[in-house]
């Protein structure tokens, strides 16, 4: 039986870390699901790793839906969550609801992820959760606001900024978010937030004190040319693929094929 949003709460209660990764297509989603990943996110990071853009901003709702449908076919166990892309939910709770329902109805995801905190986003999260749509919050470095933040920088470094993030986390929990992603914030702050919340936190570049961890799978596997500084790849598939293609190319050019 597949995991639900309540399963993640139980993992936190048992002090069992949540394992989360991103997925963009069927084959990889199936591998990750069978490997026991708890949460799979079809993230707007696919704008960069799958579509070749330089930020998450250009990806559209229809593009993300296409990838979500492919990933859905490969997932049996993991909780499947989709990012709502930039420009598809910020205007109003009603706009967010209209977009989110497409992901649940057309792509079969179980929840959506929104970036940002109060006041506007807590109102939106409350509207969605009261309407039956589970929401994963996202605080700290929020890539959709990269221009406003002045780049991909650590957030919450000052006492005032840290206090604001704590308040936002509590507000999102109060609005009904089932979990929070904490990205690129000081490790001790991530631990403090995790301790104050009943809902689980999932960190990315936020240290070991969150209730789980998430990475972009392309970064984890060494497929990204320039991964974020906080990523320690667990494989070098870029080099492995290059070597395999090189061997194949050499065989074809020398013998026509390897079938003999």
Curated annotation (Swiss-Prot):
Keywords: Cytoplasm, Magnesium, Metal-binding, Pantothenate biosynthesis, Transferase. Its cofactor is Mg(2+). Pfam families: Pantoate_transf (PF02548). SUPFAM superfamilies: Phosphoenolpyruvate/pyruvate domain (SSF51621). The keyword DNA-binding does not apply. It catalyses: 3-methyl-2-oxobutanoate + (6R)-5,10-methylene-5,6,7,8-tetrahydrofolate + H2O = 2-dehydropantoate + (6S)-5,6,7,8-tetrahydrofolate. Pathway: Cofactor biosynthesis; (R)-pantothenate biosynthesis; (R)-pantoate from 3-methyl-2-oxobutanoate: step 1/2. Binds 1 Mg(2+) ion per subunit. 3-methyl-2-oxobutanoate binds at residues 44-45, 83, 113. Its EC number is 2.1.2.11. GO terms for cellular component: cytoplasm. It comes from the Bacteria. The active site is at residue 183. It is found in: Cytoplasm. GO terms for molecular function: 3-methyl-2-oxobutanoate hydroxymethyltransferase activity; magnesium ion binding. GO terms for biological process: pantothenate biosynthetic process. Mg(2+) binds at residues 44, 83, 115. Belongs to the PanB family. Catalyzes the reversible reaction in which hydroxymethyl group from 5,10-methylenetetrahydrofolate is transferred onto alpha-ketoisovalerate to form ketopantoate. PANTHER family: 3-METHYL-2-OXOBUTANOATE HYDROXYMETHYLTRANSFERASE (PTHR20881:SF0). Homodecamer; pentamer of dimers. HAMAP family: PanB. This is 3-methyl-2-oxobutanoate hydroxymethyltransferase. It comes from Gloeobacter violaceus (strain ATCC 29082 / PCC 7421). The lineage of its organism: Bacteria, Bacillati, Cyanobacteriota, Cyanophyceae, Gloeobacterales.
């Amino acid at each position: 039986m597949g995991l639900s949003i309540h399963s993640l709460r139980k993992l936190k209660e048992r002090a069992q870390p949540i394992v989360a990764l991103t997925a963009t297509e069927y084959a990889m989603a199936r591998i990750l699901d069978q490997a026991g990943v708890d949460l799979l996110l079809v993230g707007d990071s696919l704008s960069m790793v799958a579509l070749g853009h330089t930020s998450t901003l250009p990806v559209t709702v229809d593009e993300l839906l296409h990838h979500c449908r492919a990933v859905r076919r490969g997932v049996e166990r993991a909780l499947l969550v989709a990012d709502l892309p930039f420009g598809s939910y910020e205007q109003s709770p009603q706009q967010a609801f209209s977009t989110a329902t497409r992901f649940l109805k057309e792509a079969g995801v179980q929840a959506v992820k929104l970036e940002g905190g109060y006041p506007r986003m807590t109102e939106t999260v409350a509207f969605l959760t009261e309407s039956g749509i589970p929401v994963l919050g996202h605080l700290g470095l929020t890539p959709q606001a990269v221009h406003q933040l002045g780049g991909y920088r650590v957030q919450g470094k000052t006492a005032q900024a840290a206090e604001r993030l704590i308040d936002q986390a509590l507000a999102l929990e109060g609005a009904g978010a089932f979990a929070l992603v904490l990205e690129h914030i000081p490790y001790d702050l991530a631990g403090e937030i995790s301790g104050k919340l009943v809902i689980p936190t999932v960190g990315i570049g936020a240290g070991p004190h969150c209730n789980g961890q998430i990475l972009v799978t392309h970064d984890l596997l060494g497929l990204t040319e320039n991964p974020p500084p906080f990523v320690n790849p667990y494989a070098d598939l870029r080099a492995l693929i290059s070597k395999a293609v090189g061997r194949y190319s050499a065989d074809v050019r020398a013998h026509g094929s390897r079938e003999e």
